[in-house]
Amino acid sequence: MKLTRRDFIKNALIWGGSLIFSPYPSYASAQTEHQGYPGYSRLEKEGKLAERVQEAYAFFEECRLCPRECGVNRLDGEKGFCKAPLKVMVYTAQPHFGEELSLVGRHGSGTIFFSNCNLRCVFCQNWPISIRGEGRAIEDEGLAQLMMFLQEIGCHNINLVTPTHVMPNIMKATRLAFKKGLRIPLVYNTSGYERVEILKLLDGMVDIYLPDIKYMDADMAATYSSGARDYPEMATAAVLEMNRQVGVHQVDKHGIAQSGLMIRHLVMPNRVAGTKKFAAWVAENLPRYTYVKIMSQYHVDYKAYEYPDIARGISVQEFLEAMDWAEEYGLTGLDPRSVRIRDLYKKSK
């Protein structure tokens, strides 16, 4: 039986638990103007997307989707470090208005939060989702249906949050959704803890990469992200590959992001994130007009109270220092809201 849009919305509103597929009625009739076709459209028309899906699913047999390289057979129900099952686990799917302005536009970024995570930071603000694994298991066909729903209600993109461990499911769902009419860009919203080999499977499919670069020091990464000592090496290599694939941030005539790299860096107390080194690395390895968001919203969450160096929020001075470093190294693609926050802080001094 064909599921109508009304039935889907009725069934998708699951409160107090895992899925909140918010319909936002005031935006339901909005039509976003899309410039051209997204990358996955070209791959499908060239006959390459089906091959990529098959190749990606093969990684489940001996899972090495992320740098942990657990080697478990997820096809047989084994679970590795991230604790993810074979089926994709989704916590929420809804328009999100707190992302970067070019992603949000007027009608929101179509954000899908996946449960579980391959990094498991001790300060994670989404720890019930990423670490405890709250969410509902759905088939790839259901994920495709969510993508279509988000497009139908006017979202400007499909924003895939914490996608690394479910990348094969995403690829299959995207192909299914394309056949049903999906035509908006894919945003790969990742912690940055990626393998270049895996990212190459996404070449031509992902339109916008939205990675974190959390740390520039191996000891900090090991301490605060569950032993991921190789995080700086893996994240910087991953970002270089992302830049090779999609280049710099591009928007349409309405200011809506269509493609490109958008880097996030969270300022942490006591210079834990290595922000000065981060700014220098971007300046030396990427175009200086690369989109960079210096984030000020660190707060103490999950197990951060157990670690003295990060057991407080950041100070105004720490944020201003971070922005000064970005400008000192000539970064001109700074997120406009970060710049406005900086200016407000300076005026209040």
Predicted features and spans:
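Hydrophobic faces of well-ordered beta-strands that scaffold small-molecule active sites
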Residues: 158, 186-188, 209-211, 261-263, ...
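Auxiliary Fe-S-binding modules of radical SAM enzymes
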Residues: 2-5, 9-23, 29-76, 247-349
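Iron-sulfur cluster-binding cysteine motifs and their immediate structural context
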Residues: 65-83, 122-129
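Non-cysteine beta-strand/loop elements that form the S-adenosyl-L-methionine
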Residues: 203-217, 291-297
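Residues immediately within or flanking Cys/His clusters that coordinate Zn2+
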Residues: 60-63, 67, 79, 111-114, ...
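Conserved Radical SAM active-site core
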Residues: 83-204, 208, 218
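Conserved radical SAM core fold
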Residues: 130, 167, 192-195, 213-232, ...
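Anionic-ligand binding region
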Residues: 233-252
